[in-house]
From Swiss-Prot:
Topology term for the membrane: Single-pass type I membrane protein
Motif (WSXWS motif): 220-224
Gene field: IL2RB
Keyword Disulfide bond tagged: yes
Name of protein: Interleukin-2 receptor subunit beta
Gene3D superfamilies given in the database record: Immunoglobulins (2.60.40.10)
Amino acid sequence: MAAPALSWRLPLLILLLPLATPWASATVNGTSQFTCFYNSRANISCVWSQDGALQDTSCQVHAWPDRRRWNQTCELLPVSQASWACNLILGAPDSQKLTTVDIVTLRVLCREGVRWRVMAIQDFKPFENLRLMAPISLQVVHVETHRCNISWEISQASHYFERHLEFEARTLSPGHTWEEAPLLTLKQKQEWICLETLTPDTQYEFQVRVKPLQGEFTTWSPWSQPLAFRTKPASLGKDTIPWLGHLLVGLSGAFGFIILVYLLINCRNTGPWLKKVLKCHTPDPSKFFSQLSSEHGGDVQKWLSSPFPSSSFSPGGLAPEISPLEVLERDKVTQLLLQQDKVPEPASLSSNHSLTSCFTNQGYFFFHLPDALEIEACQVYFTYDPYAEEDADEGVAGAPTGSSPQPLQPLSGEDDTYCTFPSRDGLLLFSPSLLGGPSPPSTAPGGSGAGEERMPPSLQERVPRDWDPQPLGPPTPGVPDLVDFQPPPELVLREAGEEVPDAGPREGVSFPWSRPPGQGEFRALNARLPLNTDAYLSLQELQGQDPTHLV
């Protein structure tokens, strides 16, 4: 019968055994309290409280970090009947032994016979349980009858939050306790304070504590050691309000200055004397600027004004004479210059009886404003007869009849007929770059003379108004080379075997301006001169080169 009774009791004991073990552990933990704080450098302070007194038992705190290879142990010392405390020294006081990611396992071990029993255990996060050391080096910087300035320092504070601190201070006055003293809070890192509204010749005590703003379970540091100081006694007969005396002195000085100025100005005897004293230090500008007194009578405004009247700055004069120009669109000019070979070459143009020259008038307009309309350089073309009619005394009567050109009759000054565009070959002769990207052409009137003659219809028919672009082709056979000029008539006559007399000193140069304008003749440009393609000539330069033609 005993065996069956034991068989059903054994499972019941096994079921109750795991329930009894946690109950016993909870009882032990429920009767003790284990609290630790980190001073942010190399110290962990712990306090352990136990309800039941431990008789003749030694206990210690063991620290084991999860990321470090070291471990530390400190002996718990009794603080009261049921409390023990110790400090875990991790290294040098100012060394940074732990960081925000470290977790330290703290255990309270008590000896029971030959074995150590775990009384409490905690996973300690250092930067969530901060308590700094109490401030040190308190000193009185300045003390007066009603005020006192005190400073202090912080020791063993981590660089992780050295600027994120707050302070509390309290002052103990006579007849009160520390608990009754009002708290003065400083919400920033300020290691000084100015105490005001103090009583003269009175003894005070001062304390301060610090707390970092980081950490969930962070608490205030212990209070610093009290600093005793005494205010200065009040002087006998001295006004208790010092600023009132300064105010009275300032007002008295201001009124005295106003009265003195009034008397100096209104007094008849001191008036001229004062003016004489003030005037002797003022220099006379007429001594340095004679024109101010001689011409303007001392009037500074007239002296500084412009010597020219305002009407001289207005454009009231006659506008300068500018050669008539014709500005065409770029696309239209390109078509005019590139498609001239559609019209067959007239015989008169291929006979080298006339030459065509061109110049640009952009150099005449020497100014260019930033906001002005941008217009490309206009090409101005004029045509003249290359060979003038030789005089009878020059001895060229034996020249071939077919090679003598007809003289070009000068145009009247009142006629504004524009010159026609030169042929495509003529453009290549003077400015080969015109075919690639010509500028808008313009025309210029011819010189004045007795007769008046317009260009032949064959030249005018070569400049149609609306042409389509056409690619350039090789030159037409029979047309003379476009690069060389037609030789002068003296060279032609010498090649023909006829005698040609030498030209005089004034006739040896074959420039169009080599003869006076009254002769009614024109000279062709010397073929030996270098070509001036796309040259920028002003109006004065053109008139100086060819006085008989006003462009």
